């Protein structure tokens, strides 16, 4: 399993909480959350989303020519459960 940053786990959690979100849906969800101090920019969002896609934790699909959708995989859900168990100890 790839080691994720706290920010990447935040993106993974957002993908889990939303239904077929676009990258911008994920950005808005994270920006609205209590743990994000400043608005996220494109240069931070998409490379980190790509990392969790490449790790097999999220699948990237197309909504249209300009918009991708991100769907959490079973491995992504397992990673969130493992992280939650680790943080609760």
Residue ranges and their predicted role:
Residues 2-40:
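N-terminal helix-turn-helix DNA-binding core of bacterial DNA-binding proteins
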Residues 29, 63-66:
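Short linear capping/connector segments at secondary-structure termini
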Residues 43:
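Key DNA-contact positions within bacterial/archaeal DNA-binding proteins
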Residues 46-50:
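Short, hydrophobic-biased segments on the C-terminal half of alpha helices
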Residues 53-64, 71:
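Beta-hairpin "wing" of winged helix-turn-helix
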Residues 81-89:
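Amphipathic alpha-helical dimerization/coiled-coil segments
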